Amino acid sequence: MSQEVIRGIALPPPAQPGDPLARVDTPSLVLDLAPFEANLRAMQAWADRHDVALRPHAKAHKCPEIALRQLALGARGICCQKVSEALPFVAAGIQDIHISNEVVGPAKLALLGQLARVAKISVCVDNAHNLSQVSQAMVQAGAQIDVLVEVDVGQGRCGVSDDALVLALAQQARDLPGVNFAGLQAYHGSVQHYRTREERAEVCRQAARIAASYAQLLRESGIACDTITGGGTGSAEFDAASGVYTELQAGSYAFMDGDYGANEWDGPLAFENSLFVLATVMSKPAPDRVILDAGLKSTTAECGPPAIFGEPGLTYTAINDEHGVVRVEPGAQAPDLGAVLRLVPSHVDPTFNLHDGLVVVRDGVVEDIWEISARGFSR
């Protein structure tokens, strides 16, 4: 991943295979393979146990190498949130991709049609006008696409919340050229971060009841509803066991982050931190304060500042563009100048989008660098 920016001067990669973790240039995004692989196995086993397909969400990582490993363990396909985001995954040979979002605009619809010609693509709709646009785009591209009617199961974002409209959209999708009605998108994003397990369980039950009622309405009207897709890392335990969902769209489970870490995880499903931002102590201006070289351009903070892994006496207190201010708590030892620390991002999805590559390590030794090739693909 070296890049020549001036003749004869190249930006070197952050690490080489065989390098110890302490030699990785910082700031860098690092994946620890042992907990990562354990997380993949745990979620796949949970889905298999409940006879639910796993369709991991690639918006979490934007990295085809990760998606390929999820598929190798048994995932049915993947989700992407934007049409452009799907491009690198199709290029990597992934053939079953659900765009878990509405697609609006001529350029994006044309791209959707191109992708649907070379891969099995599905997309969400929640209004008749957009459904007609998708149909026209598929006809122009000479393609077919599965459409799922998105229903609002409690988040209050996109999605239909009216029986008559759900039925009308499903009927319209059956009749229009270029599209096939495939089922329902029923995702509740807010519940993923409800802190107590009991609260998540109750809201998931409510969401499942809403999704089931729409599916029953369709079936009673003679319309098959083969797919009900949704769920996430925080709700997977309950969604899989509900008997309603046919697919789970969890993504962050592979990595975990500070926000998910704040949830109560005392049930049968739990995951480990596998993703870190590596940072170096660049300054020690006071006995109780050190400065790191990783700030907002290395890890996002909309869910709070990152945590410092394995260092309970160090607290990341302020985040700037390229600096992180760390308080050394009373009684704790300040790290040395040049010391390398592991940060746990508070939100993995946008943190991945800040990096070009992922340094992959096992037992503290670099194995590879994986390209985050869908970084910035947000159209």
Swiss-Prot record:
Q: How does activity depend on temperature?
A: Stable below 55 degrees Celsius.
Q: InterPro entries under this entry? A: Ala_racemase_N, D-amino_acid_metab_enzyme, D-ser_dehydrat-like_dom, D-ser_dehydrat-like_sf, PLP-binding_barrel
EC numbers listed for it are: 4.1.2.42
UniProt keywords, alphabetically: Lyase, Pyridoxal phosphate
Q: Which cofactor does it need?
A: pyridoxal 5'-phosphate; Mn(2+); Co(2+); Ni(2+)
A GO BP term here is: D-serine catabolic process
- Cross-referenced SUPFAM superfamilies: PLP-binding barrel
A Pfam family in this protein?
Answer: Ala_racemase_N
Top-level taxonomic group: Bacteria
Which Gene Ontology MF annotations are present? aldehyde-lyase activity; D-serine ammonia-lyase activity; D-threonine aldolase activity
Please summarize the record's notes on activators and inhibitors of this protein: Inhibited by the carbonyl reagents hydroxylamine, phenylhydrazine and semicarbazide. Inhibited by the chelating agent EDTA. Inhibited by the sulfhydryl reagent p-chloromercuribenzoic acid, and by sodium cyanide. Inhibited by iodoacetate, Ag(2)SO(4), HgCl(2) and CdCl(2). Competitively inhibited by beta-hydroxyaspartate and O-phospho-DL-threonine.
Question: Which reactions is this enzyme annotated as catalysing?
Answer: D-threonine = acetaldehyde + glycine; D-allo-threonine = acetaldehyde + glycine
On cofactor binding, the record's note says:
Binds 1 pyridoxal phosphate per subunit. Binds 1 Mn(2+) ion per subunit. Can also use Co(2+), Ni(2+) and Mg(2+).
* CDD domains cross-referenced by the UniProt entry: PLPDE_III_LS_D-TA
pH dependence of activity: Optimum pH is 8.0-9.0. Stable between pH 7.0 and 8.5.
N6-(pyridoxal phosphate)lysine modified-residue sites: 59
- Function noted in UniProt: Catalyzes the reversible cleavage of D-threonine or D-allothreonine into glycine and acetaldehyde. Can also cleave D-beta-phenylserine, D-beta-hydroxy-alpha-aminovaleric acid, D-beta-3,4-dihydroxyphenylserine and D-beta-3,4-methylenedioxyphenylserine into glycine and the corresponding aldehyde compounds. Inactive towards D-serine, beta-hydroxyaspartate and O-phospho-DL-threonine.
Q: Which family does it belong to?
A: Belongs to the DSD1 family.
Under which name does UniProt file this protein? D-threonine aldolase
Organism, by scientific name, is Arthrobacter sp
